[in-house]
Curated annotation (Swiss-Prot):
The lineage of its organism: Bacteria, Pseudomonadati, Pseudomonadota, Gammaproteobacteria, Vibrionales. Belongs to the sigma-54 factor family. Keywords: DNA-binding, DNA-directed RNA polymerase, Nucleotidyltransferase, Sigma factor, Transcription, Transcription regulation, Transferase. GO terms for biological process: DNA-templated transcription initiation. This is RNA polymerase sigma-54 factor.
Length: 486
C-alpha cells in the first residue's frame, strides 16, 4: 500500500481553555477557590474585587475587633478564680452508668485543670504538637540526672498515641546493656514520667493507668477504696460489663456498685488522646437554605468568595499595538474568562442545590427519618446535566440549613425496598436505628436481629448484616457492650 497525503473534512469535540477552566473551578472547594482567586488577583492587574465585598470584609474585621475588646473589658472587670474554672470543668455527677470513658473525657478535659497562661502549651484539643513533643517539653523543665534523663527519653520514645508503653521495661533495660542500670531505676523514672501531664502516660496497661489516677484523689473521696479494689481484682469483669458477677464477687449492693462505677468513669483510659495532632478543618457554606413565608429559599452565599470586576482604568490602556497593549489585552481576556467561569459555577451550583432541596423537602421539614433515596443520576436528569458534572458540583460543597451544615453529597443515598413497593433511604434507616437504640431497654439492649425485625414491622426489609454495617457507621456499640446496670 503506497503512503499518501489526504484531506478529510469532519467534526470533533474539542475542549477549549475556557471550558477547561470552568470545569476545574467547578470541582474546587470554597477555600481552594478563594486561594485560586487570590492568586489571580496577584498575577492579573485587570482584576479587582468589588467594593461592596471589601466593605463587608472590613466591617467583619471591625466587628471581630470590637468583640475582642468587649471581651477583654469583661475579663478585666470580672476576673475569675482558676479554682472556679476547674470546678466548672468537672464531670457531672449525673452521668449514666453506661457512659464510656471515651464519652466522659472530652478533648477539653485535663488532669491538671485549665492552663490560663497564654505562653504555656495548651493540650486540651487546641495544640497540634505530638504527645512526645509535649512530654519532652516537660522533661526539659524537670530536674533529672544524665542517666535518668536518658531513661526518660527512651520511655517517652516508646509511648503510643494513647499514652501507653509499646515495649516492656525489660526491653528498655536491654537498650542500656552497656550501662550499669537496674530495672528498679527504670521503674523509678517511669513513675516520675507518669506524673507528667496528661496524668497516666507511660502506663504499662489500663489497670496501671486508672489506678495511678485514682491515687491522686483525696483519701476522703467516697467509694475510693472500693474503686481501687474493683480495678485490682475484677477489671476483666468490669470490661465485660458482667455486673451480676461483680456484685456476687465484691458483695457490693447494686446501689453501691453504681456509685463505684460513677467514680471510675471519671478516669481517663486513654490520656494520650488529649493531645490533638490534627489540624482543624474549616468549611465555608457555598449555599444557604432558609424558610420564607412557608417556602424554602436557596441562595448562593455572597461571602463565600470575592466578587470580581474588571479594572476599567487598566482596560482602557489596551488600545494600540505596543507590547504593553498586547499584555493588557491578554490579561483582560483572561480576567473575563475567569469572571464568566465563576458566574457559570454559581449558576450550576445554585441549580443543583435547588434540585436537592426540592427533592429532599421532607428532610428539611422533619429530619433524617424523612430523607428520600436519591442518586446523582436523579439530579442529572432533573437539571439536564451530565452525571460527572453533578459529582463535581456536589463534592466539597456545603449547604447551610436550619438543621446544620451538610456537604451536598450527604443528601445522596442508596435505597431499600419496602413491603408497600416504595423505597426508603439508607440515611433514613440509619436515623431509625439511632432512634430505636436510644429508646431501647438498657437492661436488655436490642440486637441487630431484633432491630431488623422492628424495621420489618414498619415494612422495611433490611438484612441483619446491613443493620450491623449501619450501626457501626453510626458509632453505636454492639448490644453486648450497650448493657447497663439497672
Amino acid at each position: 500500500m503506497k503512503p499518501s497525503l489526504q484531506l478529510k473534512l469532519g467534526q470533533q469535540l474539542a475542549m477549549t481553555p475556557q471550558l477547561q477552566q470552568a470545569i476545574r473551578l467547578l470541582q474546587l472547594s470554597t477555600l481552594e477557590l478563594q486561594q485560586e482567586i487570590q492568586e489571580a488577583l496577584e498575577s492579573n492587574p485587570l482584576l479587582d474585587v468589588e467594593e461592596a465585598y471589601e466593605e463587608n470584609a472590613t466591617a467583619d474585621v471591625h466587628s471581630i475587633n470590637e468583640e475582642k475588646e468587649a471581651s477583654a473589658e469583661v475579663l478585666d472587670i470580672e476576673p475569675q478564680d482558676s479554682s472556679d474554672l476547674i470546678e466548672k470543668s468537672e464531670i457531672s455527677s449525673e452521668l449514666e452508668i453506661d457512659t464510656t470513658w471515651d464519652d466522659v473525657y472530652s478533648a477539653n478535659t485535663g488532669s491538671t485543670g485549665i492552663a490560663l497562661d497564654d505562653d504555656m502549651p495548651v493540650y486540651q484539643g487546641e495544640t497540634t504538637q505530638t504527645l512526645q513533643d509535649y512530654l519532652l517539653w516537660q522533661l526539659d523543665l524537670t530536674p533529672f540526672s544524665d542517666t535518668d534523663r536518658s531513661i526518660a527519653l527512651a520511655l517517652i520514645d516508646a509511648i503510643d498515641d494513647y499514652g501507653y508503653l509499646t515495649v516492656s521495661l525489660d526491653d528498655i533495660l536491654e537498650s542500656f546493656a552497656d550501662e550499669n542500670i537496674e530495672l528498679d531505676e527504670i521503674e523509678a523514672v517511669r513513675k516520675r514520667v507518669q506524673q507528667f501531664d496528661p496524668l497516666g502516660v507511660a502506663s504499662v496497661n489500663l489497670q496501671d493507668c486508672l489506678l495511678l489516677q485514682l491515687a491522686t484523689y483525696p483519701a476522703s473521696t467516697p467509694w475510693l477504696e472500693e474503686a481501687k479494689q474493683l480495678l485490682i481484682q475484677h477489671i476483666d469483669l468490669l470490661g465485660n460489663r458482667d455486673y451480676k458477677l461483680i456484685i456476687k464477687e465484691t458483695k457490693l449492693k447494686e446501689e453501691d456498685l453504681r456509685e463505684v462505677l460513677q467514680l471510675i468513669q471519671q478516669l481517663d483510659p486513654r490520656p494520650g488522646n488529649n493531645i490533638s495532632t490534627e489540624h482543624a478543618e474549616y468549611v465555608v457554606p457555598d449555599v444557604s437554605v432558609y424558610k420564607d413565608h412557608g417556602k424554602w429559599v436557596v441562595t448562593i452565599n455572597p461571602d463565600s468568595v470575592p466578587k470580581l470586576k474588571i479594572n476599567q482604568q487598566y482596560a482602557a490602556l489596551g488600545k494600540g499595538n505596543s507590547a504593553d497593549s498586547n499584555y493588557i489585552r491578554s490579561n483582560l481576556q483572561e480576567a473575563k474568562w475567569l469572571i464568566k467561569s465563576l458566574e457559570s459555577r454559581n449558576e450550576t451550583l445554585l441549580k443543583v442545590a435547588k434540585c436537592i432541596v426540592e427533592h429532599q423537602r421532607d428532610f428539611f421539614e422533619y429530619g433524617e427519618e424523612a430523607m428520600k433515596p436519591m442518586v446523582l443520576n436523579d439530579v442529572a436528569l432533573a437539571v439536564e446535566m451530565h452525571e460527572s458534572t453533578i459529582s463535581r458540583v456536589t463534592t466539597q460543597k456545603y449547604m447551610h440549613t436550619p438543621r446544620g451544615i451538610f456537604e451536598l453529597k450527604y443528601f445522596f443515598s442508596s435505597h431499600v425496598s419496602t413491603d408497600s413497593g416504595g423505597e426508603c433511604s439508607s440515611t433514613a434507616i440509619r436515623a431509625l436505628i439511632k432512634k430505636l437504640v436510644a429508646a431501647e431497654n438498657t437492661a436488655k439492649p436490642l440486637s441487630d436481629s431484633k432491630i431488623a425485625d422492628l424495621l420489618a414491622d414498619q415494612g422495611i426489609q433490611v438484612a441483619r448484616r446491613t443493620i450491623a454495617k449501619y450501626r457501626e457507621s453510626l458509632g453505636i456499640a454492639p448490644s453486648s457492650q450497650r448493657k447497663r446496670l439497672l
